[in-house]
């Protein structure tokens, strides 16, 4: 009770000082037990069931709307324009011109123009539409949760950029919504789809490293060149002109961006699929660089800078394994996500160069010169090439080549294409709402640890008792016949969409609306465009019906 009062006092003080300590939840129930801070797991309401292995009916066409079109959102629109069987229905951003700018990707792909939404509550009008299946959220962090919550309450699946939830209260709310609505709540963790991580996952699942007993992950990325590029929310009381991300770091302690490092190693360690995180301890440095940045910008030293320059979180699992996660966006050093797996038979490490070390005859009959393998040194190039060829992940086989052509290392496209694949085939998604909660809760749990002299803090069981029912992490696949049929329908849809858009001359009519001389002319042009677009959708439905 004393701790609860202390936390509430801290939150009130931060509120009075203008800070929004979003990594702390007033609703979190906590108590001490023998020096450990115990986070209580709320009971599941009687009318809810878990969503492990959740599926939704197959979608021949995935109708998607995008909310948040600043830094990452526009590239997501571009990627979806290159995935067959998708219709981009709507584009939304607080600033209308940013939403409008992303139309160029649909224009370049000769697709039907999307509808535009803007303003503080534009996403609410968007979510009320009946013709949207998926809302793809790439806003600033503060808006991830409210947009997702509203979308799910209006019957939409959601895919949320990271971090998808900022505290435990938001984690539990998304879990309850997914369980109540039976809708997917997908964390857009692209690093789970990078090539080295996917191949290492395939190796781990086949026992190449033996039992994985320890793992490391990180987000180490000096962001000094980006701080001013982040959006400045006019409603966020940003009087010091910090822009949202630096402001969030100043106001919040803990690993506020854990998922890039944690997601891939959690999959390798079967988290909530036979094991679960039970306890963490977090420790951070003082803020040296962050605090100095604010002082240089404002001319005065900040009263408080909550986020340390480097944060380290150690976690233990129910099966006695350990994971270490680091966060540093302040100090100058090469980009690094660590990704290290320590197993009873081998070791994998991605940075600074991707390597493997194996013991015994793990690679028997796989690569040349196997007699001299031992774990005292990394595999040579020929051995490494043979290992990666043998364990090249099936998802990379399907999407990897096009992914590389789409930029950013390919992992973003692979993530989006795989998401659409699962929705079109009615399969469980690769990450569920429990993954989202487990990977995003480090911010609040770590802050609680560090605010209490780096005390041990327990994890709640986000599955509420079901973490040991699924044995091992795995991806779901359709049969070859089902894949072929689904892909044929998807390709046919995209071809037909392009044909009706061209036949109706939609982009010329769209431009007529934008270039109208006055309001009266614009109203007239808008009516002509809307009639043509409605007719194009009717023609599209007819084309697809004939092809069936």
From Swiss-Prot:
SUPFAM superfamilies associated with the record: Glyceraldehyde-3-phosphate dehydrogenase-like, C-terminal domain, NAD(P)-binding Rossmann-fold domains
One GO MF term attached to the UniProt entry: nucleotide binding
Asked if the record carries the keyword Signal, the reply is yes
Annotated signal sequence is 1-21
In which domain of life is the source organism classified? Bacteria
- Report the enzyme's class at the first EC level: hydrolase
Which residues take part in binding NAD(+)?
A: 71-72, 93, 141-144, 161-162, 190, 240-244, 257
- Per UniProt, where does substrate bind? 219, 245, 257-260, 335
Note on cofactor? Binds 1 NAD(+) per subunit. The NAD(+) cannot dissociate.
**Pfam families with a match to the protein in the record:** GFO_IDH_MocA, Glyco_hydro_109_C
Q: Cofactor(s) for this protein?
A: NAD(+)
Q: For this protein, what is the EC number? A: 3.2.1.-
Q: Which UniProt keywords apply?
A: Glycosidase, Hydrolase, NAD, Signal
| Keyword Signal set for record | yes
Do you know which InterPro entries this protein is assigned to? Gfo/Idh/MocA-like_OxRdtase_N (IPR000683), Gfo/Idh/MocA_oxidrdct_glycsds (IPR050463), Glyco_hydro_109_C (IPR049303), NAD(P)-bd_dom_sf (IPR036291)
Question: What is its biological role?
Answer: Glycosidase.
Q: Which family does the record assign?
A: Belongs to the Gfo/Idh/MocA family. Glycosyl hydrolase 109 subfamily.
This protein is called what?
A: Glycosyl hydrolase family 109 protein 3
């Amino acid at each position: 009770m004393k701790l609860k009062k202390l936390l509430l006092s801290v939150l009130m003080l931060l509120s009075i000082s203008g800070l929004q300590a979003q990594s702390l939840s007033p609703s979190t129930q906590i108590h001490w037990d023998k020096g450990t801070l115990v986070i209580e797991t709320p009971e599941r309401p009687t009318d809810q069931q878990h969503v492990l292995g959740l599926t939704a009916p197959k979608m021949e066409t995935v109708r998607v709307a995008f909310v948040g079109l600043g830094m990452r959102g526009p590239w997501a629109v571009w990627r979806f324009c290159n995935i067959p069987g998708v219709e981009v229905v709507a584009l939304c951003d607080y600033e209308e011109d940013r939403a409008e700018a992303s139309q160029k990707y649909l224009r370049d792909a000769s697709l039907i123009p999307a509808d535009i939404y803007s303003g503080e509550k534009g996403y609410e009008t968007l979510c009320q539409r009946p013709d949207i299946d998926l809302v793809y959220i790439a806003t600033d962090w503060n808006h991830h949760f409210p947009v997702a919550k509203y979308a799910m309450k209006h019957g939409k699946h959601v895919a949320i950029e990271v971090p998808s939830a900022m505290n435990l209260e938001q984690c539990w709310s998304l879990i309850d919504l997914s369980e109540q609505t039976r809708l997917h709540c997908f964390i857009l963790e692209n690093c789970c789809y990078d090539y080295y991580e996917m191949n290492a996952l395939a190796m781990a699942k086949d026992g190449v490293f033996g039992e994985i007993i320890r793992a490391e992950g990180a987000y180490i990325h000096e962001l000094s060149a980006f701080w001013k590029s982040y959006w400045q929310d006019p409603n966020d009381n940003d009087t010091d002109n910090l822009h949202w991300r630096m402001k969030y770091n100043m106001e919040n302690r803990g690993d506020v961006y854990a998922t890039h490092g944690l997601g891939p190693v959690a999959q390798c360690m079967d988290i909530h699929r036979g094991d679960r995180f039970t306890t963490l301890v977090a420790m951070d440095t003082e803020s040296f660089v962050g605090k100095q940045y604010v002082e240089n910008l404002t001319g005065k030293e900040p009263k408080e800078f909550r986020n340390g320059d480097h944060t380290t979180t150690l976690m233990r699992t129910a099966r006695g394994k350990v994971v270490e996660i680091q966060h540093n966006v302040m100090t100058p050093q090469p980009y690094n996500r660590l990704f290290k797996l320590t197993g009873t038979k081998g070791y994998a490490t991605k940075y600074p160069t991707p390597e493997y070390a194996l013991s015994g005859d793990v690679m028997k009959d796989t690569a040349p010169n196997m007699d001299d393998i031992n774990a005292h040194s990394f595999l040579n190039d020929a051995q490494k090439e043979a290992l990666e060829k043998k364990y090249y992940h099936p998802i990379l086989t399907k999407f990897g080549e096009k992914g590389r052509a789409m930029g950013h290392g390919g992992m973003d496209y692979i993530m989006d294409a795989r998401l659409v694949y699962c929705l079109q085939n009615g399969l469980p998604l690769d990450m569920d709402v429990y993954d989202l909660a487990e990977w995003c809760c480090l911010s609040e749990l770590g802050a609680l640890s560090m605010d209490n002299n780096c005390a041990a803090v327990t994890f709640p069981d986000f599955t509420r008792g079901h973490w040991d029912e699924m044995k091992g992490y795995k991806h779901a696949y359709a049969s070859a016949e089902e894949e072929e049929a689904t892909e044929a329908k998807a390709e046919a849809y995209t071809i037909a969409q392009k044909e009706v858009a061209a036949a109706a001359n939609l982009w010329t009519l769209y431009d007529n609306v934008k270039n109208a001389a006055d309001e009266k002319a614009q109203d007239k042009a808008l009516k002509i465009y809307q009639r043509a677009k409605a007719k194009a959708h009717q023609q599209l439905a007819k084309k697809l019906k004939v092809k069936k």
